[in-house]
């Protein structure tokens, strides 16, 4: 695939709609219309033509738009070199057949009032009809494209948003603002009949959707439904009474464009088989993200995804007639060309294949022709439940209701309000014309207000009310995970079904050979995997976790979490999992139990800083998630902070604060990746410098297995990446010179050391905690903090004190002796050290 973005902006940086007809690309935007040769654009994208030679065939100024001071929004290409364009209140026809010396002339078709706006414009080439939807009147007008005569008009219940025409010339799909979808049958005379109605199907949006049916006419696309709590687009099967044929999972929530390629594609199922499968391709784009996604109707996952093609949002997409090109226009005037190679999307079948596929669809019975003289003269009031056109007397089947997304909030399936036959109370008729034949002597009962109910089917409260949305991995074709140096778990994803399952293989690789330990298959997509000391685990895209031994034997039945997994980490006997809604699980695989009750990461994301009643907002990213061999979860954020979860307190605790690097003299035990943040030895020797404390600090620095050191390195990396490190170091120096902040550096240093000591004990890194405790005691003794020094020794001396519970009595006594000897020459604490030395016999032993 080749992508070309024209360097110059078109139409003064404003493009709204494009159409391809007879190898020509028509683009309207602003007050201009330009015509391009589509093959020349594709050749320029593939490198066959120099981009500098690419120019439009024609560019014309639309006089009617200039005179009415409006911008072009709508464009359809008719037969015989004619096209219809329009704005919000204007509709005009442009004849492209002209002499070489004459100019293009526009003919005005209709002008609408200021409060009457055109919401969509479509053309049916089979019957030569033009469909215009109007907002104020809530109507849809059907016009003859040759005489511009108004054939008929359909009165709608709500404002029409978008129109989808049928390539077979029989069905007209209208999307209304009340989230319902009306499907009408029509003919060349303009006669219409309501064919089917689907309630609460799409989200309400004032902007029109740009959608097309499949070229053979068997599928209608619908945007922004919900599938397993993931925004999707669904394809409705015309043959199966518009039931869902396929859901495109992983779809962007704000999509506004979904267009089918005009060709059908085929692909051989396997190299050894001659069987082929046919499929269609769809191109879609969101309203703000600037992405372009291509779908294969035989797959539920995207076939191709181009991110941030343009800086603004894409206003329209259009396929080339060859099926190998795709054009995209943006709101800021950019034209983007996607040129696909042959066989890249599949084998493009000839045009006749579309005709043959269309013949397999059973057409509807023709509508009875009703002359105008027989039509009723009385026009029904708008916005009523009665239809102006002919309706089917048979009861229509209830359409399937599909949950959709109207914003970033979660919505629920609304209950049905259809009245059963055995209910005597009937809804009050609003239209007096329909009630004129009914008895009026019976007093109508008061109409009760409708009650909204929550649907209990497929209802997960943790998802519906969760304010946390974490990203989860995309599905990869294959990936590997290494553990313990020589074990490699190889994941090869299939199609996610039993026809081609996912392969999972564990191999032990030595220097010269490799041995397969086990292999298994799953009819699902695998997204993450991890390993511990005696187990392997992997998760699927549906939130199911499998745990096996090294030999491949299942240790537990598959665990279903209900939502995708964002993090899956193992260490020792523990397996940590964080789901996409922020729930955290930690299991002890050896005992087969959960290590602590289920918790979440919601509190780490500073929810109160970005709190909103009904809007989800961005928070700090989780840059790392891990679990220690002792079963302690550790999380780092993009702001540099690191946290651990304490199972005894059942709360998250701060390991390192991004504030401490700016003032703590003991922060830079390890340098950031690629940036040395430490100073030289002379700068370290301040008035509180101590040789023994310096030696202990170097021992802590050289401990490569220290969890705290690693997390401090992560903090340094984040601060350096954001460019805040040098700036805040200068800021700290300026702050120290201000009145009232003279001891700021001392307080930050002590806070940092105290936290490191407490965290080391909770992480069960006892040796590192002892070294840090010695450094801390020497530091506070030199600073003259006698109370803190005395309290620390009293905690160590008291065997019932649980602050340093990992230390037994003998280690506590020996640690006190080491501290007393290290601080013996510090005059400020000699009274404290002497009392403890006498109690422990240090003085008598030395004498």
From Swiss-Prot:
It is found in: Nucleus. Residues 368-399 are annotated as: Disordered. The keyword Repressor applies. Keywords: Chromatin regulator, Nucleus, Repeat, Repressor, Transcription, Transcription regulation, WD repeat. WD repeats lie at residues 10-46, 113-153, 155-194, 259-305, 309-348, 508-548, 558-597. InterPro entries: HIR1-like (IPR031120), HIRA-like_C (IPR011494), WD40/YVTN_repeat-like_dom_sf (IPR015943), WD40_repeat_dom_sf (IPR036322). Its main location: nucleus. GO terms for biological process: chromatin remodeling; DNA-templated transcription; regulation of DNA-templated transcription. It comes from the Eukaryota. Transmembrane segments: none annotated. Residues 384-394 have a biased composition (Polar residues). PANTHER family: MEMBER OF THE HIR1 FAMILY OF WD-REPEAT PROTEINS (PTHR13831), PROTEIN HIR2 (PTHR13831:SF1). Belongs to the WD repeat HIR1 family. This is Protein HIR2. It comes from Kluyveromyces lactis (strain ATCC 8585 / CBS 2359 / DSM 70799 / NBRC 1267 / NRRL Y-1140 / WM37). The gene is HIR2.
């Amino acid at each position: 695939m080749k992508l070309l973005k024209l360097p110059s902006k078109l139409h003064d940086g404003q493009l709204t709609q494009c159409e391809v007809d007879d190898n020509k690309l028509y683009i309207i935007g602003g007050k201009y219309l330009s015509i391009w040769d589509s093959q020349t654009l594709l050749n320029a994208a593939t490198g066959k033509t120099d981009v500098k030679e690419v120019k439009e065939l024609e560019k014309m100024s639309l006089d009617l738009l200039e005179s009415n001071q409006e911008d072009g929004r709508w464009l359809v290409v008719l037969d015989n070199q004619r096209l219809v364009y329009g704005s919000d209140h204007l509709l005009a026809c442009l004849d492209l057949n002209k002499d070489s010396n004459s100019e293009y002339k526009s003919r005005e078709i209709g002008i609408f009032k200021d409060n009457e706006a055109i919401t969509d414009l479509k053309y049916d080439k089979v019957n030569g009809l033009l469909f215009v939807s109007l907002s104020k009147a809530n109507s849809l007008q059907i016009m003859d494209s040759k005489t511009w005569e108004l054939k008929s008009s359909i009165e709608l219940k709500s404002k029409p948003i978008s129109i989808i025409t049928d390539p077979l010339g029989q069905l007209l799909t209208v999307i209304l603002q009340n989230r319902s979808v009306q499907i009408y049958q029509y003919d060349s005379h303009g006669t219409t009949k309501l064919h089917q109605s689907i309630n609460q199907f799409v989200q309400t949006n004032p902007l029109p959707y740009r959608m097309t049916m499949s070229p053979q006419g068997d599928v209608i696309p619908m945007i922004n439904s919900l599938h397993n709590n993931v925004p999707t687009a669904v394809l409705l099967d015309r043959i199966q009474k518009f039931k869902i044929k396929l859901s495109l999972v992983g779809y962007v929530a704000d999509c506004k464009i979904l267009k089918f390629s005009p060709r059908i594609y085929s692909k051989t199922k396997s190299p050894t088989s001659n069987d082929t499968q046919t499929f269609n391709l769809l191109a879609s784009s969101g309203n703000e993200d600037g992405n372009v996604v291509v779908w294969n109707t035989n797959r539920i996952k995207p076939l191709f995804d181009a991110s941030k093609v343009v800086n603004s949002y894409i206003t329209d997409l259009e396929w080339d007639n060859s099926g190998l090109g795709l054009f995209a226009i943006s709101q800021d005037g950019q034209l983007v060309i996607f040129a696909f190679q042959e066989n890249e999307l599949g084998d493009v079948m000839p045009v006749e294949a579309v005709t043959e596929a269309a013949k397999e669809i059973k057409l509807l019975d023709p509508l009875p022709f009703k002359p105008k003289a027989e039509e009723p003269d009385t026009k029904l009031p708008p916005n009523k439940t009665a239809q102006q056109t002919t309706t089917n007397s048979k009861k229509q089947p209830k359409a399937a209701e599909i949950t959709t997304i109207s914003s970033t909030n979660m919505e629920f399936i609304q209950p049905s309000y259809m009245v059963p036959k055995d209910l005597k109370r009937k809804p009050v008729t609003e239209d007096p014309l329909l009630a004129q034949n009914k008895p009026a002597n019976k007093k109508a009962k008061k109409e009760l207000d409708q009650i909204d109910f929550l649907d209990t089917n497929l209802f997960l409260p943790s998802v519906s009310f969760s304010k946390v949305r974490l990203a989860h991995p995309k599905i990869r074709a294959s990936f590997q995970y290494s553990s313990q140096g020589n074990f490699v778990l190889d994941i090869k994803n299939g199609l996610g079904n039993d026809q081609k399952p996912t392969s999972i293989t564990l191999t032990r690789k030595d220097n010269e050979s490799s041995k397969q330990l086990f292999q298994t298959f799953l009819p699902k997509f695998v997204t993450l995997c991890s390993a511990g000391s005696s187990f392997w685990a992997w998760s699927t895209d549906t939130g199911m976790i499998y745990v096996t031994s090294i030999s491949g034997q299942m240790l537990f039945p598959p665990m279903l979490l209900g939502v995708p997994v964002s993090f899956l980490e193992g260490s020792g006997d523990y397996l940590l999992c964080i789901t996409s809604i922020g729930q955290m699980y930690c299991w002890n695989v050896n005992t087969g139990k959960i290590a602590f009750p289920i918790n979440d990461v919601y509190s780490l994301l500073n929810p109160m800083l970005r709190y909103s009643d009904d809007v989800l907002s961005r928070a700090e990213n989780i840059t790392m998630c891990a679990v220690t061999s002792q079963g302690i979860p550790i999380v780092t954020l993009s702001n540099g902070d690191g946290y651990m979860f304490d199972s005894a307190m059942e709360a998250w605790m701060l390991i390192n604060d991004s504030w401490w690097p700016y003032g703590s003299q003991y922060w830079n035990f390890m340098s950031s990746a690629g940036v040395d943040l430490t100073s030289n030895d002379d700068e370290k020797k301040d008035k509180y410098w101590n040789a023994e404390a310096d030696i202990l600090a170097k021992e802590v620095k050289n401990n490569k297995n220290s969890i705290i050191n690693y997390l401090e390195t992560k903090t340094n990396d984040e601060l350096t990446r954001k460019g805040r490190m040098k700036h805040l170091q200068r800021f700290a120096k300026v702050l120290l010179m201000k009145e009232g902040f003279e001891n700021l550096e001392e307080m930050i240093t002590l806070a940092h050391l105290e936290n490191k000591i407490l965290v080391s004990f909770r992480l069960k890194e006892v040796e590192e905690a002892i070294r840090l405790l010695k450094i801390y005691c020497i530091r506070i003794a030199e600073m003259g903090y006698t109370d803190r020094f005395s309290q620390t020794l009293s905690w160590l001396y008291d065997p019932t004190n649980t602050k340093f519970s990992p230390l037994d009595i003998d280690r506590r006594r020996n640690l006190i002796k080491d501290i007393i000897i290290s601080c013996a020459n510090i005059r400020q604490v000699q009274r404290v050290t002497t009392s403890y030395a006498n109690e422990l016999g240090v003085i008598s032993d030395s004498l």
